[in-house]
Amino acid sequence: MAAGTPVWSSRFAFIMASVGFAVGLGNIWRFPYVTGENGGGAFVLVYLLFVFAIGVPCVMAELMVGRRGQSSPSKSMAAVAQESGLSRLWGGVGGLGVFTAYTISITYAVVVGWVLWYLVQALMTGFAGYDAAMATSTFEGLLADGSTMLIMTILGNLIVGGIIFAGVTGGIERAVTFMMPLLFALLIGLGIYNMFAGGFGETLSWLFTPDFSKIDGPVLLAAVGQAFFSIGVGMGGMMAYGSYLPANFSITRGAMMIVLADTLVALLAGLVVFPMVFNYGLDMAGGAGLIFQTLPVAFAQMPGGHIFAVLFFVMLSVAGVTSMVGLLEAVTSWTDQKTTLGRELSAVVVVGSVTFCSIASVFSYNVWQDYTLFGMNFNAASEGLYDKITLPLGGLLIALFVGWFMKRDFAFSELATDEQTFGIWQLLLKFVVVPAIAIILITGLI
Protein backbone atom coordinates (compact mmCIF):
# COMPACT_ATOMS: atom_id res chain seq x y z
CA MET A 1 0.00 0.00 0.00
CA ALA A 2 1.08 3.59 -0.59
CA ALA A 3 2.39 5.39 2.49
CA GLY A 4 -0.42 6.97 4.48
CA THR A 5 -3.21 5.14 2.65
CA PRO A 6 -5.75 3.62 5.08
CA VAL A 7 -6.44 -0.11 4.82
CA TRP A 8 -9.67 -1.96 5.57
CA SER A 9 -9.14 -4.05 8.70
CA SER A 10 -11.25 -6.92 7.37
CA ARG A 11 -13.05 -8.18 4.28
CA PHE A 12 -16.33 -7.94 6.19
CA ALA A 13 -15.82 -4.23 6.87
CA PHE A 14 -15.10 -3.53 3.21
CA ILE A 15 -18.10 -5.52 1.97
CA MET A 16 -20.42 -3.82 4.48
CA ALA A 17 -19.13 -0.37 3.53
CA SER A 18 -19.48 -1.05 -0.20
CA VAL A 19 -22.94 -2.58 0.15
CA GLY A 20 -23.96 0.36 2.34
CA PHE A 21 -22.82 2.75 -0.36
CA ALA A 22 -24.58 0.84 -3.15
CA VAL A 23 -27.80 0.28 -1.19
CA GLY A 24 -29.65 3.56 -1.17
CA LEU A 25 -33.20 4.76 -0.71
CA GLY A 26 -33.88 3.96 -4.38
CA ASN A 27 -33.42 0.25 -3.67
CA ILE A 28 -36.30 0.42 -1.22
CA TRP A 29 -38.76 2.72 -2.94
CA ARG A 30 -37.99 2.31 -6.65
CA PHE A 31 -36.95 -1.25 -7.46
CA PRO A 32 -40.13 -3.07 -6.31
CA TYR A 33 -42.36 -0.62 -8.16
CA VAL A 34 -40.32 -0.77 -11.38
CA THR A 35 -40.34 -4.56 -11.16
CA GLY A 36 -44.09 -4.82 -10.84
CA GLU A 37 -44.75 -2.30 -13.59
CA ASN A 38 -42.44 -4.05 -16.05
CA GLY A 39 -43.50 -7.66 -16.04
CA GLY A 40 -42.86 -8.83 -12.49
CA GLY A 41 -40.87 -12.04 -12.46
CA ALA A 42 -39.90 -11.64 -16.11
CA PHE A 43 -38.37 -8.24 -15.32
CA VAL A 44 -36.53 -9.74 -12.33
CA LEU A 45 -34.97 -12.38 -14.57
CA VAL A 46 -33.90 -9.77 -17.13
CA TYR A 47 -32.63 -7.47 -14.37
CA LEU A 48 -30.57 -10.26 -12.79
CA LEU A 49 -29.05 -11.00 -16.18
CA PHE A 50 -28.10 -7.35 -16.67
CA VAL A 51 -26.93 -6.76 -13.10
CA PHE A 52 -24.37 -9.53 -13.46
CA ALA A 53 -23.48 -8.70 -17.07
CA ILE A 54 -23.17 -4.95 -16.37
CA GLY A 55 -23.04 -4.37 -12.62
CA VAL A 56 -20.37 -6.88 -11.64
CA PRO A 57 -17.89 -5.89 -14.39
CA CYS A 58 -18.37 -2.18 -13.55
CA VAL A 59 -17.79 -2.70 -9.83
CA MET A 60 -14.72 -4.83 -10.58
CA ALA A 61 -13.33 -2.11 -12.85
CA GLU A 62 -13.73 0.68 -10.27
CA LEU A 63 -12.33 -1.37 -7.39
CA MET A 64 -9.39 -2.43 -9.53
CA VAL A 65 -8.46 1.13 -10.55
CA GLY A 66 -8.83 2.29 -6.95
CA ARG A 67 -6.57 -0.41 -5.54
CA ARG A 68 -4.01 -0.02 -8.32
CA GLY A 69 -3.86 3.76 -7.84
CA GLN A 70 -4.20 3.73 -4.02
CA SER A 71 -5.37 7.32 -4.02
CA SER A 72 -8.41 9.51 -4.62
CA PRO A 73 -10.50 8.67 -7.71
CA SER A 74 -8.87 11.33 -9.89
CA LYS A 75 -5.31 10.52 -8.81
CA SER A 76 -5.92 6.78 -9.15
CA MET A 77 -7.21 7.19 -12.70
CA ALA A 78 -4.29 9.47 -13.60
CA ALA A 79 -1.71 7.11 -12.09
CA VAL A 80 -3.08 4.00 -13.79
CA ALA A 81 -3.33 5.87 -17.10
CA GLN A 82 0.29 7.02 -16.86
CA GLU A 83 1.37 3.50 -15.93
CA SER A 84 -0.41 2.27 -19.07
CA GLY A 85 1.43 4.81 -21.23
CA LEU A 86 -1.58 7.12 -21.52
CA SER A 87 -2.20 10.75 -20.66
CA ARG A 88 -2.76 11.70 -17.02
CA LEU A 89 -5.76 13.67 -18.30
CA TRP A 90 -7.69 10.42 -17.77
CA GLY A 91 -7.66 11.54 -14.15
CA GLY A 92 -10.46 13.90 -15.15
CA VAL A 93 -12.76 10.88 -15.35
CA GLY A 94 -12.17 10.23 -11.66
CA GLY A 95 -12.72 13.93 -11.03
CA LEU A 96 -16.03 13.71 -12.89
CA GLY A 97 -17.08 10.92 -10.51
CA VAL A 98 -16.20 13.10 -7.52
CA PHE A 99 -18.22 15.99 -9.00
CA THR A 100 -21.17 13.63 -9.52
CA ALA A 101 -20.94 12.38 -5.94
CA TYR A 102 -20.88 15.95 -4.64
CA THR A 103 -23.84 17.01 -6.78
CA ILE A 104 -25.91 14.00 -5.75
CA SER A 105 -25.09 14.63 -2.08
CA ILE A 106 -26.61 18.10 -2.19
CA THR A 107 -30.11 16.85 -3.04
CA TYR A 108 -29.79 13.42 -1.39
CA ALA A 109 -28.97 15.03 1.96
CA VAL A 110 -32.39 16.69 1.95
CA VAL A 111 -34.16 13.37 1.33
CA VAL A 112 -32.19 11.79 4.19
CA GLY A 113 -33.47 14.69 6.28
CA TRP A 114 -37.04 13.76 5.35
CA VAL A 115 -36.41 10.19 6.49
CA LEU A 116 -35.05 11.37 9.83
CA TRP A 117 -38.06 13.67 10.31
CA TYR A 118 -40.43 10.79 9.60
CA LEU A 119 -38.48 8.63 12.05
CA VAL A 120 -39.16 11.25 14.71
CA GLN A 121 -42.87 11.26 13.78
CA ALA A 122 -42.93 7.46 13.93
CA LEU A 123 -41.40 7.52 17.41
CA MET A 124 -43.84 10.17 18.63
CA THR A 125 -47.13 9.08 17.07
CA GLY A 126 -46.69 5.94 14.96
CA PHE A 127 -48.92 7.81 12.45
CA ALA A 128 -51.99 6.95 14.51
CA GLY A 129 -55.20 8.15 12.87
CA TYR A 130 -53.61 8.85 9.51
CA ASP A 131 -55.73 8.59 6.38
CA ALA A 132 -54.73 9.41 2.80
CA ALA A 133 -55.61 13.09 3.12
CA MET A 134 -53.71 13.50 6.38
CA ALA A 135 -50.65 11.66 5.05
CA THR A 136 -50.59 13.87 1.96
CA SER A 137 -51.05 17.09 3.91
CA THR A 138 -48.30 16.07 6.35
CA PHE A 139 -45.79 15.48 3.57
CA GLU A 140 -46.80 18.65 1.73
CA GLY A 141 -46.53 20.54 5.01
CA LEU A 142 -42.98 19.28 5.48
CA LEU A 143 -42.02 20.37 1.96
CA ALA A 144 -43.44 23.82 2.64
CA ASP A 145 -41.52 24.13 5.93
CA GLY A 146 -38.03 25.12 4.84
CA SER A 147 -36.77 25.63 8.40
CA THR A 148 -37.66 22.11 9.53
CA MET A 149 -36.21 20.57 6.38
CA LEU A 150 -32.99 22.51 6.83
CA ILE A 151 -32.66 21.44 10.46
CA MET A 152 -33.15 17.77 9.58
CA THR A 153 -30.72 18.07 6.65
CA ILE A 154 -28.11 19.52 8.99
CA LEU A 155 -28.76 16.70 11.49
CA GLY A 156 -28.24 14.05 8.82
CA ASN A 157 -25.08 15.73 7.58
CA LEU A 158 -23.72 15.93 11.13
CA ILE A 159 -24.14 12.16 11.47
CA VAL A 160 -22.47 11.52 8.12
CA GLY A 161 -19.76 14.09 8.79
CA GLY A 162 -18.96 12.58 12.18
CA ILE A 163 -18.48 9.15 10.61
CA ILE A 164 -16.19 10.46 7.86
CA PHE A 165 -14.27 12.73 10.25
CA ALA A 166 -13.37 9.71 12.39
CA GLY A 167 -11.60 8.08 9.43
CA VAL A 168 -11.82 4.83 7.51
CA THR A 169 -11.20 2.40 10.38
CA GLY A 170 -12.35 4.54 13.30
CA GLY A 171 -15.45 5.93 11.60
CA ILE A 172 -16.67 4.22 8.44
CA GLU A 173 -15.80 0.67 9.54
CA ARG A 174 -17.35 1.04 12.98
CA ALA A 175 -20.50 2.55 11.54
CA VAL A 176 -21.12 0.10 8.69
CA THR A 177 -20.26 -3.07 10.63
CA PHE A 178 -23.08 -2.12 12.99
CA MET A 179 -25.53 -0.41 10.66
CA MET A 180 -25.55 -2.82 7.71
CA PRO A 181 -26.24 -6.02 9.72
CA LEU A 182 -28.97 -3.98 11.42
CA LEU A 183 -30.44 -3.08 8.02
CA PHE A 184 -30.50 -6.72 6.90
CA ALA A 185 -31.98 -7.84 10.23
CA LEU A 186 -34.73 -5.23 9.97
CA LEU A 187 -35.51 -6.15 6.35
CA ILE A 188 -35.75 -9.85 7.17
CA GLY A 189 -37.72 -9.27 10.37
CA LEU A 190 -40.23 -6.93 8.73
CA GLY A 191 -40.55 -9.32 5.79
CA ILE A 192 -41.33 -12.22 8.14
CA TYR A 193 -43.94 -10.08 9.88
CA ASN A 194 -45.61 -9.44 6.53
CA MET A 195 -45.78 -13.16 5.78
CA PHE A 196 -48.46 -13.42 8.46
CA ALA A 197 -50.10 -10.00 8.10
CA GLY A 198 -51.82 -10.35 4.73
CA GLY A 199 -50.98 -9.19 1.24
CA PHE A 200 -47.89 -11.39 1.04
CA GLY A 201 -49.30 -13.72 -1.60
CA GLU A 202 -50.31 -10.84 -3.84
CA THR A 203 -46.84 -9.35 -3.46
CA LEU A 204 -45.13 -12.60 -4.46
CA SER A 205 -47.38 -12.83 -7.51
CA TRP A 206 -46.88 -9.18 -8.47
CA LEU A 207 -43.11 -9.25 -8.08
CA PHE A 208 -42.19 -12.73 -9.23
CA THR A 209 -44.83 -14.17 -11.56
CA PRO A 210 -43.29 -13.88 -15.04
CA ASP A 211 -45.27 -12.02 -17.67
CA PHE A 212 -43.01 -12.25 -20.69
CA SER A 213 -45.55 -10.41 -22.85
CA LYS A 214 -44.43 -7.21 -21.11
CA ILE A 215 -40.78 -7.64 -22.09
CA ASP A 216 -40.22 -5.11 -24.87
CA GLY A 217 -37.69 -2.40 -25.68
CA PRO A 218 -38.66 0.05 -22.91
CA VAL A 219 -38.70 -2.73 -20.31
CA LEU A 220 -35.25 -3.92 -21.38
CA LEU A 221 -34.01 -0.34 -21.14
CA ALA A 222 -35.55 -0.05 -17.67
CA ALA A 223 -33.73 -3.22 -16.59
CA VAL A 224 -30.43 -1.95 -17.99
CA GLY A 225 -30.88 1.39 -16.23
CA GLN A 226 -31.82 -0.24 -12.93
CA ALA A 227 -28.80 -2.55 -13.16
CA PHE A 228 -26.46 0.40 -13.73
CA PHE A 229 -27.88 3.02 -11.37
CA SER A 230 -28.45 0.70 -8.40
CA ILE A 231 -24.85 -0.47 -7.82
CA GLY A 232 -23.07 2.78 -7.01
CA VAL A 233 -20.66 3.10 -9.95
CA GLY A 234 -19.69 6.31 -11.72
CA MET A 235 -19.64 8.29 -8.45
CA GLY A 236 -16.10 7.68 -7.22
CA GLY A 237 -17.22 5.91 -4.05
CA MET A 238 -16.30 2.40 -5.19
CA MET A 239 -12.95 3.68 -6.45
CA ALA A 240 -12.24 5.40 -3.13
CA TYR A 241 -13.19 2.27 -1.18
CA GLY A 242 -11.10 0.17 -3.58
CA SER A 243 -8.04 2.30 -2.81
CA TYR A 244 -8.16 1.00 0.79
CA LEU A 245 -8.12 -2.67 -0.27
CA PRO A 246 -5.15 -4.90 0.60
CA ALA A 247 -3.40 -6.73 -2.23
CA ASN A 248 -4.63 -10.16 -1.13
CA PHE A 249 -8.34 -9.32 -1.42
CA SER A 250 -10.20 -10.94 -4.33
CA ILE A 251 -11.85 -8.14 -6.29
CA THR A 252 -13.89 -10.65 -8.32
CA ARG A 253 -15.45 -12.27 -5.25
CA GLY A 254 -15.91 -8.90 -3.58
CA ALA A 255 -17.77 -7.44 -6.56
CA MET A 256 -20.03 -10.50 -6.73
CA MET A 257 -20.87 -10.20 -3.04
CA ILE A 258 -21.59 -6.47 -3.31
CA VAL A 259 -23.94 -6.87 -6.28
CA LEU A 260 -25.67 -9.92 -4.75
CA ALA A 261 -26.26 -8.09 -1.46
CA ASP A 262 -27.49 -4.97 -3.25
CA THR A 263 -29.97 -7.05 -5.28
CA LEU A 264 -31.08 -8.96 -2.19
CA VAL A 265 -31.89 -5.71 -0.39
CA ALA A 266 -34.00 -4.54 -3.33
CA LEU A 267 -35.96 -7.80 -3.44
CA LEU A 268 -36.45 -7.91 0.34
CA ALA A 269 -37.65 -4.30 0.25
CA GLY A 270 -40.44 -5.38 -2.08
CA LEU A 271 -41.50 -8.02 0.46
CA VAL A 272 -41.58 -5.35 3.17
CA VAL A 273 -43.33 -2.52 1.33
CA PHE A 274 -45.94 -4.03 -0.95
CA PRO A 275 -47.78 -6.45 1.35
CA MET A 276 -48.92 -3.33 3.20
CA VAL A 277 -50.04 -1.70 -0.05
CA PHE A 278 -52.05 -4.76 -1.11
CA ASN A 279 -53.38 -5.60 2.35
CA TYR A 280 -54.85 -2.16 2.95
CA GLY A 281 -55.94 -1.38 -0.61
CA LEU A 282 -53.65 1.60 -0.95
CA ASP A 283 -52.68 3.39 -4.13
CA MET A 284 -49.65 1.93 -5.86
CA ALA A 285 -46.97 4.56 -6.24
CA GLY A 286 -43.27 4.87 -6.80
CA GLY A 287 -40.64 7.12 -5.31
CA ALA A 288 -41.06 9.40 -2.33
CA GLY A 289 -44.86 9.29 -2.48
CA LEU A 290 -44.81 5.58 -1.66
CA ILE A 291 -42.72 6.03 1.48
CA PHE A 292 -43.99 9.31 2.84
CA GLN A 293 -47.65 9.34 1.78
CA THR A 294 -48.82 5.78 1.14
CA LEU A 295 -47.13 3.77 3.90
CA PRO A 296 -48.06 6.02 6.87
CA VAL A 297 -51.71 5.15 6.09
CA ALA A 298 -50.82 1.46 6.33
CA PHE A 299 -48.93 1.98 9.60
CA ALA A 300 -52.04 3.64 11.06
CA GLN A 301 -54.22 0.61 10.24
CA MET A 302 -51.97 -2.39 10.89
CA PRO A 303 -51.58 -4.23 14.21
CA GLY A 304 -48.31 -3.16 15.79
CA GLY A 305 -48.08 -0.35 13.28
CA HIS A 306 -46.29 2.00 15.69
CA ILE A 307 -43.39 -0.40 16.20
CA PHE A 308 -43.35 -1.36 12.50
CA ALA A 309 -43.17 2.31 11.49
CA VAL A 310 -40.26 3.01 13.83
CA LEU A 311 -38.28 -0.01 12.61
CA PHE A 312 -39.06 0.82 8.98
CA PHE A 313 -37.74 4.37 9.23
CA VAL A 314 -34.71 3.21 11.21
CA MET A 315 -34.00 0.90 8.26
CA LEU A 316 -34.45 3.77 5.78
CA SER A 317 -32.20 6.00 7.88
CA VAL A 318 -29.44 3.39 7.77
CA ALA A 319 -29.75 3.08 3.98
CA GLY A 320 -29.64 6.84 3.52
CA VAL A 321 -26.74 7.53 5.88
CA THR A 322 -24.47 4.73 4.58
CA SER A 323 -25.02 5.89 0.99
CA MET A 324 -24.16 9.46 1.95
CA VAL A 325 -21.00 8.24 3.67
CA GLY A 326 -19.82 6.58 0.45
CA LEU A 327 -20.63 9.65 -1.63
CA LEU A 328 -18.85 12.10 0.64
CA GLU A 329 -15.91 9.77 1.32
CA ALA A 330 -15.08 10.04 -2.39
CA VAL A 331 -15.18 13.84 -2.17
CA THR A 332 -13.25 13.94 1.12
CA SER A 333 -10.54 11.66 -0.28
CA TRP A 334 -10.19 13.95 -3.30
CA THR A 335 -10.08 17.11 -1.15
CA ASP A 336 -7.56 15.60 1.25
CA GLN A 337 -5.15 14.76 -1.57
CA LYS A 338 -5.68 17.92 -3.62
CA THR A 339 -5.14 20.31 -0.70
CA THR A 340 -3.06 20.65 2.46
CA LEU A 341 -6.12 20.59 4.72
CA GLY A 342 -5.64 17.05 6.03
CA ARG A 343 -8.28 14.35 6.44
CA GLU A 344 -10.27 15.84 9.33
CA LEU A 345 -10.48 19.40 8.04
CA SER A 346 -11.26 18.10 4.54
CA ALA A 347 -14.24 16.23 5.99
CA VAL A 348 -15.44 19.39 7.74
CA VAL A 349 -15.10 21.51 4.60
CA VAL A 350 -16.80 18.94 2.34
CA VAL A 351 -19.75 18.25 4.63
CA GLY A 352 -20.09 21.93 5.50
CA SER A 353 -20.17 22.99 1.86
CA VAL A 354 -22.68 20.28 0.96
CA THR A 355 -24.89 21.47 3.81
CA PHE A 356 -24.64 25.07 2.58
CA CYS A 357 -25.48 24.08 -1.00
CA SER A 358 -28.39 21.98 0.28
CA ILE A 359 -30.10 25.23 1.25
CA ALA A 360 -30.88 25.71 -2.44
CA SER A 361 -32.36 22.21 -2.59
CA VAL A 362 -34.47 22.78 0.52
CA PHE A 363 -35.85 26.11 -0.69
CA SER A 364 -36.57 24.74 -4.17
CA TYR A 365 -39.48 22.91 -2.55
CA ASN A 366 -41.01 26.11 -1.18
CA VAL A 367 -39.84 29.74 -1.33
CA TRP A 368 -37.65 29.29 -4.42
CA GLN A 369 -39.87 26.88 -6.31
CA ASP A 370 -40.76 29.51 -8.91
CA TYR A 371 -37.14 30.38 -9.67
CA THR A 372 -36.21 28.27 -12.67
CA LEU A 373 -33.52 27.84 -15.31
CA PHE A 374 -34.72 26.46 -18.65
CA GLY A 375 -38.00 25.63 -16.93
CA MET A 376 -36.36 23.65 -14.10
CA ASN A 377 -35.83 24.57 -10.46
CA PHE A 378 -32.59 23.74 -8.64
CA ASN A 379 -33.56 20.18 -7.76
CA ALA A 380 -34.83 19.27 -11.22
CA ALA A 381 -31.74 20.78 -12.85
CA SER A 382 -29.39 18.97 -10.46
CA GLU A 383 -31.10 15.62 -10.88
CA GLY A 384 -31.18 16.03 -14.64
CA LEU A 385 -27.46 16.82 -14.65
CA TYR A 386 -26.30 13.74 -12.76
CA ASP A 387 -29.02 11.29 -13.82
CA LYS A 388 -28.83 12.01 -17.53
CA ILE A 389 -25.28 13.27 -18.05
CA THR A 390 -22.49 13.02 -15.49
CA LEU A 391 -23.33 9.64 -13.92
CA PRO A 392 -23.72 7.60 -17.13
CA LEU A 393 -20.91 9.56 -18.82
CA GLY A 394 -18.54 8.80 -15.94
CA GLY A 395 -19.49 5.12 -15.94
CA LEU A 396 -19.03 4.93 -19.71
CA LEU A 397 -15.57 6.53 -19.63
CA ILE A 398 -14.37 4.25 -16.82
CA ALA A 399 -15.57 1.18 -18.73
CA LEU A 400 -13.88 2.44 -21.90
CA PHE A 401 -10.63 3.13 -20.07
CA VAL A 402 -10.41 -0.19 -18.25
CA GLY A 403 -11.81 -2.31 -21.07
CA TRP A 404 -10.01 -0.79 -24.04
CA PHE A 405 -7.02 1.29 -22.89
CA MET A 406 -5.63 0.03 -19.58
CA LYS A 407 -2.78 -2.43 -20.03
CA ARG A 408 -4.10 -5.98 -19.96
CA ASP A 409 -1.27 -7.23 -17.74
CA PHE A 410 -2.11 -4.67 -15.05
CA ALA A 411 -5.79 -5.64 -15.03
CA PHE A 412 -4.95 -9.34 -15.00
CA SER A 413 -2.56 -8.98 -12.06
CA GLU A 414 -5.07 -6.93 -10.04
CA LEU A 415 -7.94 -9.36 -10.58
CA ALA A 416 -5.65 -12.36 -9.92
CA THR A 417 -8.08 -14.75 -11.59
CA ASP A 418 -7.81 -17.46 -14.22
CA GLU A 419 -7.60 -16.67 -17.93
CA GLN A 420 -11.16 -17.81 -18.67
CA THR A 421 -12.77 -15.66 -15.96
CA PHE A 422 -10.61 -12.68 -16.94
CA GLY A 423 -11.54 -13.13 -20.60
CA ILE A 424 -15.27 -13.22 -19.79
CA TRP A 425 -14.95 -10.08 -17.65
CA GLN A 426 -13.05 -8.20 -20.36
CA LEU A 427 -15.50 -9.34 -23.03
CA LEU A 428 -18.47 -8.13 -20.98
CA LEU A 429 -16.80 -4.81 -20.20
CA LYS A 430 -15.93 -4.11 -23.84
CA PHE A 431 -18.96 -5.40 -25.69
CA VAL A 432 -21.83 -5.34 -23.17
CA VAL A 433 -21.12 -2.66 -20.56
CA VAL A 434 -19.84 0.05 -22.93
CA PRO A 435 -22.77 -0.23 -25.41
CA ALA A 436 -25.33 -0.54 -22.57
CA ILE A 437 -24.16 2.59 -20.76
CA ALA A 438 -23.90 4.44 -24.07
CA ILE A 439 -27.57 3.61 -24.70
CA ILE A 440 -28.49 4.88 -21.21
CA LEU A 441 -26.61 8.13 -21.88
CA ILE A 442 -28.10 8.67 -25.34
CA THR A 443 -31.69 7.87 -24.36
CA GLY A 444 -31.39 10.19 -21.37
CA LEU A 445 -30.40 13.06 -23.63
CA ILE A 446 -33.05 12.63 -26.32
Model-found features: residue ranges?
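Hydrophobic, membrane-embedded alpha-helices of multi-pass small-molecule transporters
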Residues: 9, 14-26, 101-105, 109, ...
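Inter-helical loop and helix-membrane interface segments of multi-pass membrane transporters/permeases
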Residues: 5, 34-38, 68-96, 109-169, ...
